[in-house]
Amino acid sequence: MKKGNKTVWNECIDILDNVKSPSFSANFDDYFKKSKSKPPKKNKKVLNNIKKAELKLKKKANKKQKANTLYIPPFAQQAKGIVITINKMWKNVHNDDSKQEISILSDVSLQIAYGEIVIILGSSGSGKTTLLNLIGGYDSISLGSCIVANCPLEKCTSEQLLTYRKNNLGYVYQRYNLIELLSAYDNIAISQNLIPKYQRRLDIEELAEKLDIKEILYKFPYEMSGGQKQRVAIARAIIKEPKLLLCDEPTGALDSNSAENIINLLQTINKTYKQTILMVTHDVSLTRIANRIIKISDGKIVSNQLVRPLV
């Protein structure tokens, strides 16, 4: 695969984070056949290479497991109405200079209810993104426990964490992470294809209308403004109706007007779909939409306030 094609494939890996799961390939063929956008002809070879690379991963995964084996995460019972339960969680890393372990997250304990908007505040290097990555199953827990949607993350294998993310999470990045060779519609559809048809309740065009992106649905990322790209990224994240929407500085790359629109949009999504939202930011102005505000400093939670209880 040429360098340019490899870059596109890596984008798919970063965004979907499920490509090593055999289930991803199931609808890949149908997806491109039914695609409503028509990328330039020169991109067809690139898309075919993406498909071929995915099929190779599928074959490799199948050799390592028995037929029809599912990587089902372990189960832990949480209190009713609670989506996240963290108890004395630590994240340690090895310091090459001192040859000792240092703690970048220390003794974290908290509970978050379904439907809350949680704003996690902290300066750069405070540990707020580390906390988000641990909740998302993107990093390993050193000590303690983290249960999300009845799944104890510290007990999961890497394959089980893939299943956990596919079934429970949507992720919104600061830099959008849209696949440049796909239209807005296809960027959203490729996420929807990760779930079986019988589980799909949201229609892409109806969702696009609610998120005010219907007019750009068949445009490519290079034709969009920053605010439009972030709206598409949010649509991609919520199309599969995740239990938890993780947002890492979602307004950090936007101008003030676009940022305000995204903030209002996230609040609307929370009210319309009862979506639980965890948002990492250094922007204090975002706290106006929060149910809960968590402040982190030097890897520790210094404040955890429920400022607006759920009705």
UniProtKB/Swiss-Prot annotation:
<keyword id="KW-0813">Transport</keyword>
<dbReference type="Pfam" id="PF00005">
    <property type="entry name" value="ABC_tran"/>
</dbReference>
<dbReference type="GO" id="GO:0005524">
    <property type="term" value="F:ATP binding"/>
</dbReference>
<comment type="similarity">
    <text>Belongs to the ABC transporter superfamily.</text>
</comment>
<dbReference type="GO" id="GO:0016887">
    <property type="term" value="F:ATP hydrolysis activity"/>
</dbReference>
<feature type="domain" description="ABC transporter">
    <location>
        <begin position="84"/>
        <end position="310"/>
    </location>
</feature>
<protein>
    <recommendedName>
        <fullName>Putative ABC transporter ATP-binding protein MG467</fullName>
    </recommendedName>
</protein>
<keyword id="KW-0067">ATP-binding</keyword>
<dbReference type="InterPro" id="IPR017911">
    <property type="entry name" value="MacB-like_ATP-bd"/>
</dbReference>
<feature type="binding site">
    <location>
        <begin position="122"/>
        <end position="129"/>
    </location>
    <ligand>
        <name>ATP</name>
    </ligand>
</feature>
<dbReference type="InterPro" id="IPR027417">
    <property type="entry name" value="P-loop_NTPase"/>
</dbReference>
<dbReference type="InterPro" id="IPR017871">
    <property type="entry name" value="ABC_transporter-like_CS"/>
</dbReference>
<keyword id="KW-0547">Nucleotide-binding</keyword>
<dbReference type="InterPro" id="IPR003593">
    <property type="entry name" value="AAA+_ATPase"/>
</dbReference>
<dbReference type="InterPro" id="IPR003439">
    <property type="entry name" value="ABC_transporter-like_ATP-bd"/>
</dbReference>
